Each structure stands twice: as C-alpha cells, then as structure tokens.
Amino acid sequence: MNRRKFLSLTGGGIIVAATATVGTIASRTPALALAPWDQAGVIYDEPRKRALSYAILAPNPHNRQPWMVDLSTPDQVVLRVDRDRLLPHTDPFSRQITIGLGCFLEVMLIAAAENGYAVDLDVFPE
C-alpha cells in the first residue's frame, strides 16, 4: 500500500467515524427536557392544575416563562406577570411578554375545555 492510498483510507475512516458520532449525538432525545410534555394533564387530579400543566408549556418570549399563578382562591386562577422576568432592553413596552401571557391563557382555556370545564376569563381585573 502506498502512502497516498493509506492517507486517503485513514482520512476517509476518520470522516465516517466523526459523522456517525455527530449523527448519534444530534439524534438523541433528551428525556428530561421532554418530561413536562409527557406529564401534562396526567399527574394532577385538580382541574385547575391539570389545565395549568398544559399552560406552562405555552410559547413565550425568549423562554422567560414570565408568569406567576395564584391558586389561593378555590375555583379561581389569578395570572400575574413576574416582573423579574421582564425584558427591558429587548421589549421595553412589554409587548412580547403580553403576547406570551396571552398564549398561556389560550393554552389554559383549550386544556380546560378539553377536560369539560368552561373558563370565565376576566382580563385586567381591578
């Protein structure tokens, strides 16, 4: 075997091995990252928590999840913005945060309806 053939076979083998390794790493499913989607609607018996388990998966700006939920009153969910998660530099008027909270509410409404519950939504209560 001459030197040129040896180098081409060795180089080709390295490329094939590297490609296989990258392909394996890129195609792995992160079980821990997907756990919330597997558990949504399953681990809670209480209807509010069941609907909220879906709502927390709602799309939100920069994955900040800017919501706080108060369940202290029976049969009521109070949604508030977590001011520590605002984006003052990229979203000075909180437009993106408002859209994210709207997505949260819509997913909660859909999840509640799917389980046979109606939601009376009072936006911006006093």
What are these regions (language model features)?
Residues 1-126:
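Acidic, surface-exposed loops and disordered segments
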